[in-house]
Amino acid sequence: MSIPGGEPLIHKEMPQIVEGIIARKKFVYLCTNALLLEQKLDQYTPSPYLTFSIHLDGNRERHDKAVDREGTFDKAVSAIKAARARGFRVTANCTLYAGEDPEDVANFFDYAMTLGIEGVMMSPGYSYQHAPKQDVFLGRRKSKELFREIFKVGKKRKSKWHFNQSSLFIDFLAGNQSYQCTPWANPTYNVFGWQKPCYLLVDEGYASSFKELMETTDWDKYGVGRNPKCDNCMAHCGYEGTAVEHTIASPLTALNVFLFGPRLDGEMAPELPVLHGGQAPGVAIPVSQIGRITRD
C-alpha cells in the first residue's frame, strides 16, 4: 500500500493509520517530501513493513527548482540520514522532466546510493490533465531516449545503482518493451472513493467499492493508443504491473535484464497502434513542443 504525498505527515492520525496497516502485515510506502519527517520520526517505529519513500527529483539545484522551494533538498537529505540512523527503511522517489541532463541525473543516482537508501523509484513526468506547467513533461520517445542516455552514463562509470522497480520496467523505460498499461494493478482510493481508472486521471469518476471499480470501469477505454489522455504516459503506477506480469510469464527474460542491464542501442520496441480518433480536451501539448523547464 502506498500513501501518497506531498506531505501526508500533516495528517494527525497518520501514525495510527500506518500502525493499522502494519498490524495487518501489509507493506506500506509512506511517500513524503520529508519537510516534516525529522520532527515526526518519534511517532513511528521501524518495521520491515514500513518504508519512507522520499521525494527527490535530482541533486540540490535540480530538486529545489523542480519543487519551486529553496532548501527542500537539504531538508530531505537530512531527514533521510535521520531515518536511516534510527533503522527505518528508506527509498527515494524521483520524477524526471523535460530538459534533464543525463550526466546530472547519473550524478544524483550516484549520490543517492551514498545515503544508504534501498533504492530509487524513477518515472518520467507525465502530462496528466490537472498538472501545472504542462510544458515540463516528457513524451514517450523522449523519455526512452533520456533513460538510455542515463543508463549509458551509469554503464560507462560502472555505477552500482539500485532501483526500487522490476528489471523489466527498467527495460521498458529504455525502450525495449511494448507494454500496455495495467491500471488495476495499482488502484487508487481516496475520500471520494475508488478512482477510475488510475490516480493520474481525476475526471473519470469513482466507485463506492473495489468490486464496483473492477466490474464497472471500462478498462478498454484507457491506455496508450486507446485514449489520448494516456498517450504520453509511462508512469510506474500503470506499467510496473505490466512488467511484473511479464516477469512471471518470462522469468528468464527478466533475469537477463537484471544481470546484464537493458539494451541501450539499436531499434526501440514498436509503439502500440493508435486506435482513438482524436485528442481529448486538456491533454498536454505535443511532444515536439516540449522544452526545458522554466520558472517564473
Sequence positions of predicted segments:
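Radical SAM enzyme [4Fe-4S]-AdoMet core and its adjacent flexible, acidic
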Residues: 24-27, 47-192, 196, 201, ...
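Flexible mid-to-C-terminal extensions adjoining Fe-S/redox cofactors in radical SAM and related proteins
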Residues: 195-296
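Hydrophobic side chains within well-formed alpha-helices
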Residues: 14-17, 72, 210, 229
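Short secondary-structure boundary/capping segments
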Residues: 44, 178-179, 221-225
